[in-house]
């Protein structure tokens, strides 16, 4: 049965690998030097795949690539290109721009030996491609060009093994940005040779002579891609991993066991668990590794459109830069912003870079010798930090332990080897990380930076183990000393922790205080017109929107950006504005509760509400950064393994292995496992995919005649191209959720983390309006020369001298009384525990605090917080990278003097990224941000059908060195706020690399006028004709008379009222009146104030109306109101 959400797509028949030949241009090299991964001693540069930078504007990211030749038919497979490309020729000048970080290649080799990872070995029998001859064949001088290769995910193993054949006869001239380039197709060797002859270890004479093989390129792929995948999958035999991937793509081996016979089991010997538990753990490990490896290939070899950020010329920072210098400055700033996220991934012990170990953590409540069930096993399995197990003994496929020769022993402290391991021992990745570490803040641990100073003085001895005293100002040794206090600890015990990852956010998010509660479903909106008798659900957003509409009408908030725009002129003005706003909020709360009753919305819906946001899982979401692409692959592999735990645990419990060989057992079970897993996790609450169907599976194409080309003749022939698979799943996004209400146990109300204590009278400067008091201090007290903080402290101490001109004392008393009143009123009902930093947050918090307290909620909620990156300047003495040469100082004083001299000579202060609190959390997602967060993937069984569902729970970011904003203030204060707060680290990319989409509700001029007109209609005016007020408002900024249609819009369709107003307006136009001020209009119509005139007494009637709602607009909403207290009235 076809998927109802299936999308029909098309893709061109084309090869999935291209060589690009660029002219060697200084400006291009400058840009690439900032965006790429490179190391001074490696000729290969890893760059992002961006249109108009590395590929042409109409580049096809997904293709049907010819893979097998059956005489009269070519079989094609769908694959998408990797988000990176590899510059392999002409890079001497480019890598020369890289900062020198010491001998990173040697460090990576030492790391592989220490942690038992495979090293790349150059095949001695393979012939290296002649790049000069290739350039000459397309009419280019090899010395004046720079070349890169872009390849599809399915072709990466072929590229590594030199099994791609360049066809210079099919060269194409393309325009890439400002440069005229040549691109050369690379065809799979499987088109020219039989499957039996295609392997990593041997090749035919044709492949030997014509194959595109570069040892340096293969080595880069070996570490950047394959070693990284291997460490994530706990599979140390990288060569077998590559061979398995090659066979999987060329021979459709997804449903066969490929890795298990060569797999070893790391991290099990060090766990204190029983023999039975070890068996379970090894079996589950083999299953999740195999399933994840098979399925990640299916997802990556699928259909993906280019993301919005892939067009380099459309980046706002590029489009708005007038000179090359401006462009480079903006790109460098972008790179610095990314260092905020890299810092989290490096310094958090629960980072995705470290958490590859599958551990068995027995349940404390589990009875001894109890029968193992799927639920018990699943609850005991977790991915955790692997750094403490890298040198452990391993088990082989026959469950025999293999002793590892490790002379160094276990490490107790994080070292440069661990950093290289986290970078998959790729020198280019490690160089990028060190560049960022050299530009991160130093966290002092009580030694007043003397450790850094002493290190720099000791550098003069040229004894550095990494650079031999050649570049200590920028080498990895100095970087490790600088951030030594921030590096993660090596865990001694296994524990369950969230996985910290960096992903690109999607626009839509339900992240306000109550998240999904009171959200009107789209399906219901469609049904409203069909059946008005249906019981409708509560629309909470409608009431919050009414408050924001009030703010927009009164010019308190910018209707587009949401920023504060109101202007305070005096204390009385301040009190009037805030009092009016709080009154509006309380009225909306009352209406919301009445609506809650009317729609019969139970209180339990509030307790069960969820906050959620989505992160993009398409391969091109983070294509602007090769480091994030490296991290992306780890995230997808880890998540697939986590999802596979459900199937694996059930299968292992039901069908245990009775023999010695794990791989033999897995071969017997794999067909069943693969079929079960293939659909077990889709539409289960976490991973969202898109089903696509390719429009045509058979094409008649002009394709290279492979048999003739092999014999030396180039001929294109019309041949049938048939697609292997029509329908497939594409990754779309993860849904991350948070429960605002603590429901972890029955005794949750006794949990000190969520229990609200009795508070005393609060200082307004630490309350809900503190941001306003600071912001408008100069306008509230224009003649006071002391700071806001000092003035309010004097108010609290009753110590304000009369020499301070604070204004009218009675007015000040009223103002102070109001500030204390609103602060303490808010504090009494505050269970969100967020101090507002802008008006929109104040509205959100005040509304929901009032709403929840009225419904009887008293304990604190879990709240979401954002830290956004910003750039700040720093003291250069802590950044040796500013030095222009190797440090040669005999004392600390000499170093400090030298740095001061550099500053005097004009060397700018170093700029680094820092994190600051985001006042409006929701803007993180509307501003299209890169987000770093913790994720716990919970699994639970549905009571309805006993199927397992997933819940992507937002978790914490571990470690004390990630950022100072994440650390608790002091344990002595008994402030458990940090336990209730979950933080996301973000960099907003709207108007940086993403064009801003105006999706916000924009208030047009006519809407603003309409709002003010309706306000006049609905409010009482004692002495002025409301119709004259409407005319004055409508004509304020107009030169021409509005039409009847305009007036009907302004008065919301009240035809009689519009006709009456137009009658007056026409009379004014006939009299040629130009001044439409209210004073002039009154004089024209000779209106007389009735304030002093006798009046009729309707007090008895009005008193009844006042009891019901204080105005005609509230009558229908307050028909069930009584004299009961508000809390009791609104109890459900």
UniProtKB/Swiss-Prot annotation:
Keywords: DNA replication, DNA-binding, Host nucleus. InterPro entries: DBP_sf, Viral_ssDBP_head, Viral_ssDNA-bd. It is found in: Host nucleus. Residues 1112-1132 are annotated as: Required for nuclear localization. Pfam families: Viral_DNA_bp. The keyword Lipid biosynthesis does not apply. One of its GO terms (molecular function) is single-stranded DNA binding. One of its GO terms (biological process) is DNA replication. GO terms for cellular component: host cell nucleus. Gene3D superfamilies: Viral ssDNA binding protein, head domain. Homooligomers. Forms double-helical filaments necessary for the formation of replication compartments within the host nucleus. Interacts with the origin-binding protein. Interacts with the helicase primase complex; this interaction stimulates primer synthesis activity of the helicase-primase complex. Interacts with the DNA polymerase. Interacts with the alkaline exonuclease; this interaction increases its nuclease processivity. Single-stranded DNA-binding protein required for DNA replication. Plays several crucial roles in viral infection. Participates in the opening of the viral DNA origin to initiate replication by interacting with the origin-binding protein. May disrupt loops, hairpins and other secondary structures present on ssDNA to reduce and eliminate pausing of viral DNA polymerase at specific sites during elongation. Promotes viral DNA recombination by performing strand-transfer, characterized by the ability to transfer a DNA strand from a linear duplex to a complementary single-stranded DNA circle. Can also catalyze the renaturation of complementary single strands. Belongs to the herpesviridae major DNA-binding protein family. This is Major DNA-binding protein. It comes from Human herpesvirus 6A (strain Uganda-1102).
